[in-house]
Design a protein with these regions (language model features):
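Intrinsic-disorder/low-complexity detector
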Residues: 1-161
Length: 161
């Protein structure tokens, strides 16, 4: 599995360069719907895995919710978001309750909820899902799925003083 992660980490810069040279700039595509849906799928995987660790005694299925819907997202993005909302509902509900408990991973559950909220807020302003995506949009989806989550903007708070 580690070699797969290493391979994916090598692919990400190549895809980013291809998008750059085709006129798709990072600052633009990181706010675009395909990238954000990729991030949503990634967040879904992470929350699902946390749920399995906490509730199912570390019994993690071979395929998590986000990765199970990744191919469908590249083919029928609107339908996939609908499916994702249904499949993630129990995990999101669990996280909302679990984050208030004083347990080891409860803070992480709250952090994932915050990630979902940030992505949803961006999607609310950028949401435009065509019936099919172009190859460039599929690349943005993939990059969004592989990219790390945005860091907390603590510098902005200290600069505001």
């Amino acid at each position: 599995k580690c070699s797969r992660v290493a391979q994916l980490e090598q692919i990400l810069p190549v895809l980013s360069m291809l998008l750059f040279f085709s006129g798709n700039r990072k600052d633009d595509y990181m706010e675009a719907t395909p990238y954000l849906i990729g991030q949503l799928l990634k967040a879904s995987d992470e929350l699902h895995a946390l749920y399995c660790k906490v509730v199912r005694n570390n019994q993690i299925p071979p395929q998590l919710v986000g990765s199970a819907l990744f191919v469908a997202a590249s083919e029928t993005p609107g339908r996939t978001l609908s499916q994702l909302s249904v499949r993630m509902a129990p995990y999101l509900s669990w996280a909302k309750q679990y984050r208030t408990k004083n347990e080891d991973s409860s803070g992480l559950a709250g952090w994932y909820l915050k990630v979902f909220e940030q992505i949803a807020n961006k999607l609310a302003t950028a949401y435009a899902v065509p019936m099919r995506w172009s190859d460039a949009q599929k690349a943005q989806l993939f990059i969004g799925y592989l990219a790390s989550f945005p860091k907390q903007e603590k510098q902005d708070e200290s600069n505001a003083e």
